[in-house]
């Protein structure tokens, strides 16, 4: 059965994401953490392109969705969990192993839930923090420590706790913004230009601030909604 060559194009981005994820694992296993971490960030870019290319070329398919999920497990599940383990987790023996394994398991659950709820969920938000965002937050911590050296003693335990938190957030019902259907205007265009300029000047710091704000936004929004629900219940009681 002949295959439309256009269908190969978005899947090429997905395959490239798997390749970078595997390269990240290889670099992490040889303790070249900076390269390993930036390869995960590069995988994030490819992950953002494959779906958009598929929609632009009208080549979305069930195979592409499943292939993308498998790629995400490798690039954003296995790769960052092994980076975290080889960087800090091994100091804690089986606890470090368990934390790294749980991150992958929660990420896989997050992806499976996303795949079965794609047609029914809110197109403007994700349920649970996306696994690519969680992965990038992990590797940004490693990159920041490689530059500023803040992971020492008890802060290493905090790093492992942070990884567990990210795993829980992936399978939670906390909603996070989905940037797939952004309505562009002049104000947003200017903000994106400013952000890209900051990334050009200080890529690590700019990405860390942006991802940190993204993480906190979902939690604060959830807390606000919980307080609002409790207030409304008390008011009606």
From Swiss-Prot:
It is an enzyme of class 2 (transferase). Changing residue 84 to T: In strain: A68 and UA802. GO terms for cellular component: plasma membrane. The keyword GTP-binding does not apply. It catalyses: a CDP-1,2-diacyl-sn-glycerol + L-serine = a 1,2-diacyl-sn-glycero-3-phospho-L-serine + CMP + H(+). Changing residue 237 to T: In strain: NCTC 11638. The chain crosses the membrane at residues 3-23, 25-45, 73-93, 95-115, 124-144, 150-170, 184-204, 207-227. Keywords: Cell membrane, Lipid biosynthesis, Lipid metabolism, Membrane, Phospholipid biosynthesis, Phospholipid metabolism, Transferase, Transmembrane, Transmembrane helix. Its EC number is 2.7.8.8. GO terms for molecular function: CDP-diacylglycerol-serine O-phosphatidyltransferase activity. GO terms for biological process: phospholipid biosynthetic process. It is a multi-pass membrane protein. It comes from the Bacteria. It is found in: Cell membrane. InterPro entries: CDP-alcohol_PTase-I (IPR050324), CDP-diaglyc--ser_O-PTrfase (IPR004533), CDP-OH_P_trans (IPR000462), CDP-OH_PTrfase_TM_dom (IPR043130), CDP_ALCOHOL_P_TRANSF_CS (IPR048254). It holds the Pfam family CDP-OH_P_transf. Changing residue 138 to M: In strain: NCTC 11638. Belongs to the CDP-alcohol phosphatidyltransferase class-I family. This is CDP-diacylglycerol--serine O-phosphatidyltransferase. It comes from Helicobacter pylori (strain ATCC 700392 / 26695). The lineage of its organism: Bacteria, Pseudomonadati, Campylobacterota, Epsilonproteobacteria, Campylobacterales.
